[in-house]
């Protein structure tokens, strides 16, 4: 091979020509690359079972029909509960129970809420999910983001589903003449649901009250999931049921587990019956309005066409060129899964229930959206940065929704889900998301009110212990401020995740860093200085004897145990070797704590050579990119490509752990493009190994950013040289501004590492925290 510089100069004319050439428009639907069932089975990746157990070995995704960040995830159901950690659908199951308007935190281990399930039947009426469940095969399924269908052989029904954000339309084709039924459950595990049949207006209405988990577990959230179902066909009978007991001609039923409604109608062979449904978190009228506004007709194919066009436009925000079909499937499947959350929470007229109480009903300004379900411990890392990059207006609305939560509840939430405080997981990462948005130039949210909220979390403890126990404020903030770390003596009792003192310290230090960057931009000098000092608190839990994170007592002594490779109560969901790398704000300071770059690299190497890297959980997600900071970006390129090939498979068991609201998938989107936001709240992305011949990002401001990787392949994973907008480029990072102002970045890829490219200290990401 020629020397890299000579090779680069030789290719400059080709690079310039490529930058001016646009790929031919593909006639292949981008939806055709997506199987929405990826992540619904136990993991089959190479590290499956090494770290995670039970539901941690599943992607915990669902094959949902939805609009990007829509309200409802319309999914087939094989599990009939809303209980924690049980997804509505698993690929292992062979019995179909119906269609659900799910509010599952996709890819997580939390709970569904406010849902209902409807099921078409033929011949015999069976009401409970267990009794009516009918065999199906995965070969008979078609599962895309805009359309789902399945054949139910026992019922001889072809069942199809498509929809919009808050509504859905179903088409059932009956293979034989006779009686047919529609059975509906309000899915209240607490036995608090209600349902009624309105034969005059041909509607079924009901509601399912929502309950909290984590802080305030089991308490009412103050609002319900209201649903409406409309049918066209004349019915011959209707009634209610409670488990196996039928109540013919009864118009409503409330309270108690296992309740529901049914209607009966006669069908001819091959007759198609169309049913519509919608939901609302406000009231019955909201559900009706949502259905009327989104699907005012009975044309199934028209709705399918509308949703297909929405998805095609959304996915085309990133165009890729590659001859590798599997790579396209993995990429667009990841982009689909990164488009679930946060979810739209308001009705079409802008109404939504108040945060943390459910009342009063609030009213948004026209054109605005209120979002909910922020799995923030996961998603601030890559999902929110991806939204901020591709859809900054939507990202701003998501941040303003956090501001509304502060205004309505009194505190910025930690992990806002089911429109409630939870204090689930650790850290204070709404700060990270808000800071990342503002630092990257997003301005369509109230930064002054946001700063007030963030600062309150960082400096104040709730005056009311009841509020604290209810999930408001940072856990163990008093200890953190007193010691500069959270000592082992503070067990953090008022939290779902107790203890985990070291992980909390590391995460608070990062959050303080991000808040400091916002303070600097807002000229809050005193806050900036104090928070910048606190951002170095990570040093207080790195044991100088080992260079690994370690538990520390109130008297300043570290634990004597030095096994950095075993799970421990002071670490969140992992071992010290995993969390040691959680210093995204100051990798250079971490090098100093470890004894210099050589020891830093040795420890980083061991994460991969000793199989300690755990991609199935978030604390490791930035680890592979941290070689860049030590001037060895070729190791980042190697590690990231290895993770992409081994931890993601285009199969039902294709995720190595919980997708966690799209974080796992957002990681893949960034990695496949060749850059990653190691430290959200800064404008820098670490470069990795671009995997496509061409990728085009269509920025919301009208600009396009093209990434061209000559000779990219599964073997040619190493950057030999790079050019940005016609000029040689040696930095191993790129800025947010470089991308959004548009341009072209060209890489020359090879099968051997160029250890000189990006290796100089001046080519590494800037050190911000001095």
Residue ranges and their predicted role:
Residues 18-19:
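C-terminal motif of bacterial Sec signal peptides marking the signal peptidase cleavage site
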Residues 706-711:
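Beta-strand-rich recognition domains
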Residues 718:
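Extracellular attachment/recognition segments
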Residues 511:
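ATP-dependent phospho-/nucleotidyl transfer catalytic cores
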Residues 1-8:
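Bacterial N-terminal signal peptides that target proteins for export
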Residues 24-384, 388-432, 438-506, 514-540, ...:
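Accessory carbohydrate-recognition regions in carbohydrate-active enzymes
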């Amino acid at each position: 091979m020629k020397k890299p510089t000579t090779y680069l100069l030789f290719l400059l004319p080709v690079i310039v020509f490529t930058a001016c050439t646009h790929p031919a428009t593909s006639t292949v639907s981008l939806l055709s690359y997506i199987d929405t069932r990826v992540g619904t089975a136990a993991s089959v990746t190479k590290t499956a079972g090494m770290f995670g157990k039970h539901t941690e070995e599943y992607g915990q995704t669902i094959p949902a029909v939805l609009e990007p960040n829509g309200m409802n995830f319309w999914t087939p159901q094989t599990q009939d509960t809303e209980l924690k950690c049980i997804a509505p659908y698993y690929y292992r199951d062979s019995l179909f129970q119906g269609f659900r308007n799910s509010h599952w935190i996709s890819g997580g281990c939390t709970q569904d809420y406010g849902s209902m399930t409807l099921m078409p039947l033929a011949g015999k009426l069976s009401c409970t999910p267990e009794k009516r469940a009918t065999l199906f095969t995965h070969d008979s399924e078609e599962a895309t983001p805009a359309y789902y269908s399945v054949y139910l052989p026992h019922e001889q029904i072809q069942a199809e589903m498509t929809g919009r954000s808050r509504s859905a339309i179903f088409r059932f084709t009956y293979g034989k003449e006779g009686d047919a039924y529609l059975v509906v459950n309000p899915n209240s595990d607490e036995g608090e649901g209600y349902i009624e049949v309105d034969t005059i207006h041909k509607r079924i209405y009901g509601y399912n009250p929502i309950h909290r988990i984590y802080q305030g577990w089991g308490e009412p959230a103050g609002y319900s999931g209201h649903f409406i179902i409309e049918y066209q066909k004349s019915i011959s009978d209707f009634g209610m049921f409670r488990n196996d007991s039928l109540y013919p001609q009864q118009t409503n039923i409330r309270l108690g587990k296992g309740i529901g409604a049914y209607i009966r109608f006669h069908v001819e062979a091959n007759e198609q019956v169309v049913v519509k449904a919608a939901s609302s978190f406000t009231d019955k009228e909201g559900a009706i309005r949502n259905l009327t506004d989104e699907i005012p007709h009975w044309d199934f194919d028209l709705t399918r066409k509308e949703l297909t066009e929405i998805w095609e436009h959304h996915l085309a925000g990133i165009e890729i060129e590659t001859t590798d079909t599997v790579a396209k499937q993995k990429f667009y499947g990841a982009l689909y899964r990164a488009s679930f959350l946060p979810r739209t929470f308001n009705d079409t007229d802008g109404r939504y229930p108040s945060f943390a109480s459910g009342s009063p009903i609030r009213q948004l300004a026209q054109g605005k959206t209120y979002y909910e379900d922020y799995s923030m411990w996961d998603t601030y890392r890559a999902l929110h940065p991806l939204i901020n990059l591709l859809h900054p207006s939507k990202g701003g609305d998501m941040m303003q929704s956090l501001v509304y939560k502060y205004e309505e509840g009194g505190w910025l939430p930690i992990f806002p889900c089911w429109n409630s405080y939870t204090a689930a997981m650790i850290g204070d990462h709404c700060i990270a998301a808000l800071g990342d948005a503002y630092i990257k130039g997003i301005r369509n949210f109230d930064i002054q009110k946001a700063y007030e909220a963030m600062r309150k979390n960082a400096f104040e403890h709730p005056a009311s212990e009841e509020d604290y126990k209810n999930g408001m404020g940072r856990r163990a903030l008093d200890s953190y401020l007193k010691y500069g770390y959270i000592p082992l003596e503070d067990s953090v009792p008022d939290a779902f995740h107790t203890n985990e003192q070291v992980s909390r310290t590391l995460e608070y230090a990062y959050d303080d860093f991000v808040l400091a960057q916002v303070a600097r931009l807002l000229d809050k000098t005193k806050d900036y200085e104090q928070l910048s000092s606190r951002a170095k608190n990570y040093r207080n839990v790195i044991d100088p004897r080992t260079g690994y994170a370690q538990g520390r007592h109130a008297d300043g002594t570290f634990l004597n145990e030095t096994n950095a490779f075993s799970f421990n109560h002071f670490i969140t969901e992992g071992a010290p070797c995993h969390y040691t790398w959680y210093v995204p704000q100051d990798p250079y300071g971490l090098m100093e704590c470890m004894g210099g770059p050589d020891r830093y690299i040795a420890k980083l190497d061991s994460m991969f050579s000793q199989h300690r890297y755990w991609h199935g959980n978030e604390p490791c997600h930035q680890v592979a990119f941290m070689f860049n900071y030590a001037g060895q970006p070729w190791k980042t390129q190697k590690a990231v490509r290895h993770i992409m090939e081994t931890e993601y498979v285009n199969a039902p068991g294709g995720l190595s752990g919980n997708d966690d609201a799209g974080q796992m998938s957002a990681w893949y989107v960034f990695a496949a493009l060749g850059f990653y936001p190691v430290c959200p709240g800064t404008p820098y992305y670490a470069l990795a190994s671009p995997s496509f011949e061409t990728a085009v990002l269509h920025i919301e401001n009208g600009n396009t950013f093209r990434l061209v990787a000559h000779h990219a392949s599964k073997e040619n994973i190493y950057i030999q040289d790079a050019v940005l907008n016609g000029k040689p480029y040696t930095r191993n990072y790129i800025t947010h501004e470089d991308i959004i102002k548009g341009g072209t970045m060209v890489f020359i890829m090879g099968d051997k590492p160029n250890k000189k490219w990006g290796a100089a200290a001046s080519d590494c990401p800037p050190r911000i925290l001095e």
